[in-house]
């Protein structure tokens, strides 16, 4: 059995994933690309490469996603925005509404409707909301195709997710920070960097029985956190991760009954 494991590891390194050095070079390339885009680009948007390629993998059919984070719009929990009312850093502020959304999703209440374009908002008896559908339409360019929370170019080579940033670490996830970790992973230094990092909101809602996305919900995304955790893995763990991705694509995704249960 040990001999089979060694042969599989060698095959994955030589033919599928690449060596540890190759994986690190891929990551460094996309990190430099992000730095260039952010130094030379529009200050309104911050760019973070995402997807398998940015994680250092180049599997068959690997995706390349770009998270574009709007720096002018801030999202708060209600208690946070009330306590910081006089020190808000931007005119465009949104408030999380978790109670009326499915787990893992949120509605976004508009804090001051006077600052917002009317085409972006949706009003009903429960309040005033930022619509994910209108947001994607506002961010789209000619010939863009909507692909879940992303906008794809005409060739389908790059998926762009125009996201909003959660200013604080979510209260619903604070238990993750302090829970016991008997194996010492992730280390305290990494947890500290993760909490200081970005939790994003991407424009896609949960699916109803009709398989249509809820146009008012936004998915809470820990993709930046996931990327930081993946960067901390050993190369053996990366190999296992790649095997799971191949299993998902080559086996699970081909079963139409369970395909929609997985998003990546």
PLM features per residue range, with description:
Residues 1-264:
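Non-catalytic helical "accessory" subdomain of NTase-fold nucleotidyltransferases
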């Amino acid at each position: 059995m040990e001999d089979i494991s060694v042969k599989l590891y060698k095959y994955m390194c030589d033919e599928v994933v690449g060596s540890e050095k190759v994986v690190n070079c891929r990551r460094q390339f996309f990190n430099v690309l992000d730095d260039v885009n952010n130094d030379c680009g529009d200050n309104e948007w911050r760019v973070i490469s995402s997807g398998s390629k940015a994680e250092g993998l180049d599997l068959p059919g690997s995706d390349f996603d770009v998270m574009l984070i709007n720096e002018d719009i801030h999202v708060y929990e209600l208690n946070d925005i009330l306590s910081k009312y006089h020190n808000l850093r931007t005119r465009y502020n949104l408030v999380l509404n978790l109670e009326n959304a499915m787990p893992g999703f949120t509605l976004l209440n508009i804090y001051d409707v006077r600052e917002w374009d009317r085409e972006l908002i949706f009003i009903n008896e429960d309040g005033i909301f930022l619509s994910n559908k209108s947001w994607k339409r506002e961010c789209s360019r000619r010939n863009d195709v909507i692909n879940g929370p992303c906008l794809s170019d005409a060739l389908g080579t790059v998926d762009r997710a125009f996201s909003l940033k959660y200013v604080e670490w979510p209260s619903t996830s604070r238990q993750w920070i302090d829970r016991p970790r008997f194996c010492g992973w992730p280390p305290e230094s990494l947890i500290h960097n993760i909490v200081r990092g970005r939790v994003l909101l991407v424009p896609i809602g949960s699916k109803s029985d009709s398989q249509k996305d809820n146009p008012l919900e936004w998915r809470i995304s820990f993709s930046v956190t996931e990327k930081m955790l993946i960067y901390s893995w050993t190369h053996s763990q990366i190999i296992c991760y790649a095997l799971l991705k191949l299993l998902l694509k080559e086996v699970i995704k081909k079963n139409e009954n369970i395909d929609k249960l997985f998003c990546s």
